[in-house]
Swiss-Prot record:
Membrane topology: Multi-pass membrane protein
Organism per entry: Bradyrhizobium sp. (strain BTAi1 / ATCC BAA-1182)
UniProt-listed Pfam families: BacA
Extra facts: Bacitracin is thought to be involved in the inhibition of peptidoglycan synthesis by sequestering undecaprenyl diphosphate, thereby reducing the pool of lipid carrier available.
Family as reported in the entry's similarity comment: Belongs to the UppP family.
Function field: Catalyzes the dephosphorylation of undecaprenyl diphosphate (UPP). Confers resistance to bacitracin.
Principal location listed in the UniProt entry: membrane
Protein's name in the database: Undecaprenyl-diphosphatase
GO MF, one annotated term: undecaprenyl-diphosphatase activity
Cell compartments where the protein resides: Cell inner membrane
Length: 268
């Protein structure tokens, strides 16, 4: 039987690797739970949300100077203030939909079959967007038009369906709205900060009574592992998509989703 420490490490790796790639971290965690017995009880389901903070802090660390410049500049620079407003505008749709329908979405759609179909459909869309001849007009994620931020935020709501991918939905939306591949990926990272911090705070509040000192130790392990893994993955990801696009990730989604459907059909 797998030890809790090893389980925490494996889930931390899955979270750190998949959170900022357009492949759906939630989908991969649900499939890991279904096929490998990772995270089957209440604590481990909350664990998957709690360790997202490690991945988020990796983004804060990687973009610390840029984010600090924007935060300080917002006091005197209209463009920096507009970017902060843009992130909040993009964040708002997820807050509204999450509060209204989050409980029902989890009850109805958090299912391995839904994950697999979402992975395949999302992979096909990502492949299509990567291959069509888009003409990027926006090359700086901190200078997108405000309406563009809003539509990216609306697209992010699709990621409440497990398997869709928060980063995938926001990257595709940004590219279709005129962003280049690198800036689309970067804004997806920036938008993840309030979105995932909000999810962390909400889930921690709900599960605080169930937490023991042992649980906190496991969360700390998963947190550190997801932080380190995300740091490595994000740096490599930006360089890769700038040169090669998203084809690799699109096919990964299709393959994982197809294998998952086969396994489910066979009763695995």
């Amino acid at each position: 039987m797998m030890s809790d420490t090893l389980r925490a490490v494996l889930l931390g790796i899955i979270e750190g690797v998949t959170e900022f790639l357009p492949v759906s971290s939630t989908g991969h965690l649900l499939l890991a739970e279904r096929f490998f017995g990772l995270g089957e009880d209440g604590f481990w389901k909350s664990f998957a949300i709690l360790i997202q903070l490690g991945a988020i802090l990796a983004i804060v660390a990687l973009y610390f100077f840029k984010l600090s410049r924007v935060a300080i500049g917002a006091l005197s620079n209209a463009d920096d203030r507009r970017f902060i407003i843009g992130v909040l505008i993009a964040f708002l749709p997820a807050v509204i939909i999450g509060l209204i329908a989050g409980k029902y979405i989890k009850a109805l759609l958090f299912d391995p079959w839904v994950v697999c179909f979402s992975l395949i459909v999302g992979g096909a869309i990502l492949l299509w967007v990567d291959q069509i001849d888009l003409k990027p007009r926006e090359h700086d994620a901190t200078r997108y038009p405000l309406l563009m931020y809003l539509w990216i935020g609306v697209a992010q709501c699709l990621a409440m369906i497990p398997g869709v991918s928060r980063s995938g939905a926001t990257i595709v939306a940004a590219m279709l709205l005129g962003g280049d591949k690198r800036s689309a990926a970067e804004f997806s990272f920036f938008l993840a900060i309030p979105t995932m911090v909000g999810a962390f705070v909400y889930d921690f509040y709900k599960s605080r009574a169930e937490m023991t000192s042992d649980h906190l130790g496991l969360v700390a392990i998963g947190f550190v592992v997801s932080f380190i893994t995300a740091m490595i993955v994000v740096k490599a990801f930006l360089g890769y998509v700038t040169r090669h696009g998203f084809v690799l990730f699109a096919w990964w989604r299709v393959i994982v989703g197809t294998l998952g459907l086969i396994a489910l059909a066979l009763g695995k």
